[in-house]
Each structure stands twice: as C-alpha cells, then as structure tokens.
C-alpha cells in the first residue's frame, strides 16, 4: 500500500479513496468568508502573525509526549514536522515520509524518508531520527500515543532513509496513526525539548506557557514551497472567548479559534473579519464518568444521565445551533464509518427517572465544569442540571479553575466536562478513548467485545463488513460506556480579511493547527 496506489494495495481490496480518505469530506464548508477573491492570491513572505487561542495552560510543555490541546499542537508544528500530514479533505499525505507501501495484509510497512532535510541544528534527517521519534512513545512512557502504537512489534532501519514497521496484526490505517499530533520527528537522542531542534519553518524565540509563544522564520528557504511565510509568529493564550473576539475585532490579533457561536452572526457582518465554519468535524462536547467508580458503576445511572440531558436545548442555547446532535460516542458524522443509524437519545425525563430509580443510587451526583475546558462548559453543565431536575434527579454543578484542568480534573474526578477533537479515522477515535488499554480512556470503560471488534476491523478486507464492525463498536460505546456526548460542534475560526490560509479542514480548527505554516498576508 502506498500513497501512489500499488498492486500490493489492490490486493488488500482497497481503492485509493478507501486507502487515503480517513475522514470523508462530508460537511466541509467555509461560511461567510470571501474565499473566491482570496483563492487568487499567491503565498508571499513577510509580516508578523498574531494568534489568539484557547486550548492551553501554564503547565504546557515543549515535550511532544505531553500535548493535549490546540495551543501545544499549534506551536509544535511551527518547529517540527511529522511523517504524515492530513490534508483538508482528510487524506493521509506525505510529509517527512515521501512515500510508503505495505505488503498484503498491512502488517509490514516500509516508509521512505525524504532526503536533504535538515534540523535547526544543521543535522540531516535520517532513518535513525524517525525510529527514535516513534520509540519515544513506546515502552516505558506516559505518552498518550503509546496505546495507538502498541500493535507495533519492530521498527527497523533498512537504509539511511528507509524504515520498516512490523505489527502484530495488520492495520490499513497506519499512515493515519502516524499523523497523530504527538508523533513529531526530532533528532535521534533528543532528551531536552526546551530548545526545539526541528525541521519546521520556525525557531523558538520566547517561551511563556500560559501567556505566549514567539517564533521566527528560519533563514533560507523552507523545504515546503509556499509555506512558512511569516517573519515571525506570536501565539497568545486567550482562554476567554469574549476577550479573544474583542482582540480580533480591535486588530490586536489576526486570527482566533473557537469563536463563541453566539457572536458569529454579528461577526459575519464585520467587513474586516472572515468567519470560517466547518460542519461535522468539530469538537465532541460532553461529560465523562468513571464507570469503575461509585455511583457511575451503575449502567442504569448512566442511562438516566443519557436520557436526562436535553441535547437540543443545549445546542440551541449554548452553541446557537452551530452543532449537530451527539450520540454518546465520538466518531463523527464526517467519518466514512459513522453509524448514521445510531440516533441520539431524545430527552425523556420519565425514562431517565425510571432508570435512576432502578439504579437505586443514594450518593449525591456532582459534575465538575470549567470554561477552561471549553467555552460553554459551565452553561452546558447548568442546563444539564436543569433538565435532570424534571426527572427528579439532583446534580450539583461545581465550577473549577481552567488552569490545569486537564491535569487535575479530567480523568481524576468521577464526573466532569470534556471535549474531544476529531481524529482522521474511526479506529483512532475509538482506540484512543475507549479501548481497554487506551492512554486516554477517560471513562475507564473496559469491554472485551469492543476490543476484539476494533482490532478485527483493522485487518478486515471487506469494506462492508468493516463498516458493520465499526458501526457495532459505536453502538456498544453509546449504550454501555460512561460518556454523555451531547453535541458535535462546528469548527468556528475568525480572522482578519488580510490573512490568507485559514481554510476549513477535515480534522482540527486553525487549518489543522498549521496556520503558522500554511498562512500568509495579502
């Protein structure tokens, strides 16, 4: 299997679309922005890009094994590259790997590494760097990518610029796996990440986690033609949505992520601002309960919570309609393996009350929320509380600090607010969050049936059967796991009309968090 389709790929029963289109481009749309005129512009050098973003904290690190949100992803891609990049339509495309192929069965892969690429230090990229970089996330490590790399049994150097990866069982989606944002390519032997030594377009100038990150363009031509255009980039941490919007409107920043949906209609009337909206690929918003902890061990209690939330009311009021209904699992409607038959549970206070009574729960319920998790988290929690009251269920909403939320609250407390970003394949979406050994299994859900289904689906050659297996996987998660996923949001970015390159993307906002690399000023 290669990014140039080969007989080996054909023998797997996969056509080019099936091989590379990890997320169908269903729902991609850019709204309100005057893109036809922009499309005529050609990239040019110069200027200072000022970003105002949500999705980071004072505990952020430059170590790629620690990343968990948009700001670390964004600054990391200024300095480093990956083997595989995901394009705007969700295809796996070459980055530092110029091509790849697999033997029939997809258990053995060969990646050909680009030649003539240098790190900031002047070192030339080679196979040893690639092997070391992947192995940072294998073995004894706390990296969230450990789980998705667990099937790898061996990474072997075939030549100075060729690497062979062998797996326990085949996985037709391995190129997508290697696009995980933790898997940055660093020089062999790197242990100190405080001074990024990468193959990216920029070098680090100033590092103030929780405040700002400043980078400048490297001297000479970046190895990607037309990219890495800004003289420098200033990324500011602006966690408050109103403050981000104000910074954009007043010209203090050139682009922001995660616009408050309530302000979008007004912003779209501003002739100096473009709003980029991407449907069906945005964050999955919800609440997660640890199902191995009381009282959430009770399946009936979880059903009470799932029937006791008024999803539409939250979407209409908190997200101003810029979201689709969530069905308690995180494979989104833009994925080709999405189970469209799995409908979201309608708000049913009577049914919620029935399951709550059946659960026999005497413990008080508490959900921890923070707008540091996502803008609207607190309001969503309060509306959840109100909808549960109609079922006779009492739940306290505890507001907590956004600083350190992902370190101190998420996966630590029994019930809390959460959002999940999009992954390029259903397998990655499920494996990261819901498999028994997943590093970010934030509900502590363990299902041998689910584990077996997902692992089997990776090597299933019949596309129809594979779709059925992922559909059943989603059903199991929706019915049995500890997530109340009430919405799949639209991605909503805002930018100055002078800025180019902020386009809809099948995975993440801010053009897959690569705006610093892809953008330029008109």
PLM region spans:
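Long beta-strand-rich cores associated with HINT superfamily self-processing modules
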Residues: 495-522
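N-terminal lobe/hinge region of extracytoplasmic solute-binding protein
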Residues: 52-104, 135, 197-198
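Ligand-site clamp/hinge motif
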Residues: 220-266, 386, 394
């Amino acid at each position: 299997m290669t990014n140039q389709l080969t007989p080996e790929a054909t023998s797997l029963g996969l056509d080019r679309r099936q091989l590379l289109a990890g997320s169908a481009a269903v729902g991609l749309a850019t709204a309100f922005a005057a893109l036809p005129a922009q499309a005529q512009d050609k990239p040019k050098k110069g200027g200072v890009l000022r970003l105002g973003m949500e999705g980071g904290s004072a505990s952020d690190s430059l170590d790629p094994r620690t990343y968990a949100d948009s700001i670390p992803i964004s600054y990391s891609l200024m300095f480093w590259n990956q083997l595989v990049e995901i394009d705007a339509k969700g295809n796996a495309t070459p980055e530092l790997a110029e091509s790849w192929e697999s033997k029939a069965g997809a258990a053995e892969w060969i990646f050909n590494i680009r030649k003539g690429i240098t790190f900031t230090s002047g070192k030339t990229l080679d196979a040893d760097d690639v092997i070391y970089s992947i192995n940072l996330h294998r073995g004894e490590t706390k990296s969230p990518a450990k789980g998705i790399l667990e099937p790898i049994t061996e990474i072997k150097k075939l030549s100075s610029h060729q690497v062979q990866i062998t797996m326990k069982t085949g996985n037709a989606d391995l190129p997508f796996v290697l696009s995980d944002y933790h898997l940055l390519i660093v020089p062999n032997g790197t242990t100190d990440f405080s001074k990024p030594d990468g193959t990216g377009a920029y070098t680090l100038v100033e590092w103030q986690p929780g405040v700002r990150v400043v980078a400048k363009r490297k001297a000479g031509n970046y190895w990607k033609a037309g990219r890495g255009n800004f003289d420098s980039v200033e990324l500011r941490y602006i966690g408050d949505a109103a403050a981000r919007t104000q910074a954009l409107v007043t010209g203090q920043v050139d682009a922001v992520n995660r616009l408050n949906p309530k302000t979008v209609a007004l912003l779209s009337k501003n002739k100096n601002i473009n709003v980029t909206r991407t449907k069906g690929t945005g964050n999955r918003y919800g609440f997660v309960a640890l199902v191995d902890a009381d009282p959430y061990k009770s399946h009936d209690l979880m059903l009470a919570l799932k029937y006791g939330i008024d999803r539409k009311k939250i979407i209409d009021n908190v997200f101003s309609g810029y979201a689709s209904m969530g069905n308690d699992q995180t494979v989104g409607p833009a994925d080709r393996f999405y189970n469209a038959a799995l409908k979201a549970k309608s708000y049913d206070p009577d049914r919620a009350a029935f399951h709550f009574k059946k659960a026999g729960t005497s413990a008080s319920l508490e959900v921890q929320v923070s707008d540091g998790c996502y803008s609207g988290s607190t309001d969503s929690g309060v509306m959840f509380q109100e909808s549960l009251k109609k079922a006779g269920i009492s739940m306290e909403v505890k507001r907590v600090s956004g600083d350190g939320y992902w370190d101190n609250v998420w996966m630590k407390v029994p019930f809390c607010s959460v959002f999940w970003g999009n992954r390029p394949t259903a397998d990655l979406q499920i494996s990261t969050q819901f498999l028994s050994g997943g590093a970010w299994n934030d509900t502590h859900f363990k299902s041998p049936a689910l584990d077996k289904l997902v692992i089997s689906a990776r090597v299933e050659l019949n596309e129809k059967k594979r779709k059925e297996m992922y559909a059943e996987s989603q059903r199991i998660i929706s019915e049995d796991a500890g997530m109340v996923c009430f919405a799949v949001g639209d991605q909503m970015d805002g930018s100055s009309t002078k800025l180019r390159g902020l386009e809809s993307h099948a995975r993440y906002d801010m053009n897959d968090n690569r705006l610093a690399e892809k953008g330029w000023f008109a």
